[in-house]
A protein has these predicted regions:
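Conserved blade-ending motifs and adjacent loop-strand segments that build the rim/top face
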Residues: 1-5, 37-43, 384
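Residues that define the transmembrane beta-barrel architecture of outer-membrane proteins
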Residues: 103-107, 131-135, 179-185, 202, ...
């Protein structure tokens, strides 16, 4: 392509070491007629051809009789393509690449299946966590509209939460583990309306999820036990600039998610939960740097309700693991991502290291446990040191790294491992 002034032409020049960017002054270009009956002289190509003993033009090709067969979707739903000697949640790993990373690798094993049409994706795995064995199965089918996703996790011990009277005559909840094996299941359907155009990735995605666990909670009035379950309708709007190959975050754009959580089978104990989350992307100080600012607010109805929901829609500040009781909560997160080094280094066919990068972050959360109650603060800061690489010449990029976290209000310095993968 020519420069804006039109006085120089840029083009890709292929050499022995690969492609390189080259340019020529526009006034040096030759305007000559070409005779297509005469082959164009290319010294580099002729040198390579002289080293080869096989000439495709003189090869004798035998005809192949192909017999077409009908492709039956049901028979070809599952096609195992890879496995791992550890466990990780593929869906979680894929969803963290654009906004955050998480510590999701556990001891165990994983197998993954994806059919030829890329409409049926399955993951089955076993993992060991906190002294218990777990079995995990997830399946996504994208051949319909809407997309359907189901997942189940079986392991650990289930518990019951019951009402009891304390020494002061007050009604309080007391939990105890049971002999039941813990079961957690979720079904989700969503409509991926893709409005992408040119360099803007845009879309609207309404969704509804149903969540079930066999942990049981006793209702305050009727004293009946019910398994904890909820319904979560939500809608996602997104519009951001397509990333260049070296970009870590989009240069500009936003994602807006609105959510409403309700427990239709246990309304005596729990009120509805509303949440809104806004993610914005901004250019950094230097090229390929990126700034991500995230804002969130959630509100839980407590009037006439006996318990707080054991579920939050806003993410906790990094470095805090305690689930706070909340009536109202707002959150702010800032991430600044920057590349450190792009070595393009490989060790034979074992590994290929594409890039080393860093992410500086600050998290702040303000929480009010009850109406007219005091507000509490949880905040932290830290950095991520991350490697983007490929292993054994697999086409799936892998992201690994380490996270250093320093809670500000209380808590100790922490170190976490990071993992993510893209398919």
């Amino acid at each position: 392509s020519f420069t804006h002034s039109g006085n120089r032409l840029f083009f890709a020049d292929y050499q022995a070491n690969g492609y390189r960017i080259a340019s020529l002054p526009a006034d040096s270009l030759l305007a000559e007629k070409t005779d297509f009956d005469r082959p164009v002289s290319m010294p580099f190509v002729e040198t390579l051809a002289g080293q080869e003993k096989f000439n495709l033009d003189s090869a004798r090709l035998e005809p192949v009789d192909f017999q077409p067969k009908r492709y039956r979707k049901g028979v070809h739903t599952f096609k195992i393509h890879s496995w791992a000697p550890f466990y990780y949640d593929v869906a979680e790993a894929m969803n963290t690449s654009a906004s955050d990373l998480s510590t999701i690798v556990k001891p165990g094993a994983t197998i993954m299946s994806q059919n030829t049409l890329n409409t049926a994706i399955m993951q089955a795995g076993w993992y060991y966590d906190k002294g218990y064995h777990h079995g995990k199965l997830s399946f996504t089918y994208q051949g319909w509209f809407p997309v359907v996703n189901i997942a189940a996790d079986y392991g650990d011990k289930a518990f019951d939460m019951a009402w009891a009277q304390n020494d002061k005559g007050q009604q309080v909840t007391r939990g105890y583990y049971t002999g039941r094996t813990y079961l957690e299941a979720e079904a989700r359907i969503y409509l991926p309306f893709n409005l992408t155009r040119n360099h803007r990735i845009r879309g609207i995605q309404p969704a509804v999820s149903y969540y079930f666990t066999n942990n049981r909670y006793q209702e305050y009035g009727s004293r009946e036990f019910h398994a904890f379950q909820y319904v979560l309708p939500e809608i996602l709007f997104y519009n951001y600039r397509r990333k260049a190959q070296r970009d870590i975050l989009p240069r500009n754009g936003y994602q807006l998610r609105l959510q409403y959580l309700t427990t239709p089978f246990n309304k005596e104990n729990y009120g509805a939960l509303y949440a809104g989350r806004l993610t914005t992307y901004w250019p950094g100080i230097l090229r390929n740097h990126g700034l991500m600012l995230r804002f969130g607010y959630q509100y839980q109805e407590l009037d006439g309700k006996a318990l707080y929901l054991p579920k939050h829609l806003l993410e906790k500040p990094r470095g805090y693991n305690f689930q706070y009781q909340t009536h109202r909560q707002w959150a702010f997160k800032a991430d600044y991502a920057l590349p450190i080094f792009s070595p393009d280094f490989s060790i034979g066919s074992l590994i290929y290291i594409r890039r080393m990068r860093a992410n500086l972050f600050y998290d702040l959360s303000r929480n009010q446990a009850r109406s007219k109650g005091a507000w509490t603060t949880q905040s932290s800061f830290g950095t991520d040191l991350i490697f983007d690489w490929n292993v054994l010449r697999m086409s799936y990029p892998i992201t690994t790294g380490v996270r250093l976290i320093q809670p500000i209000d209380y808590g100790k310095f922490q170190v976490e491992a990071l993992f993510s993968i893209s398919f």
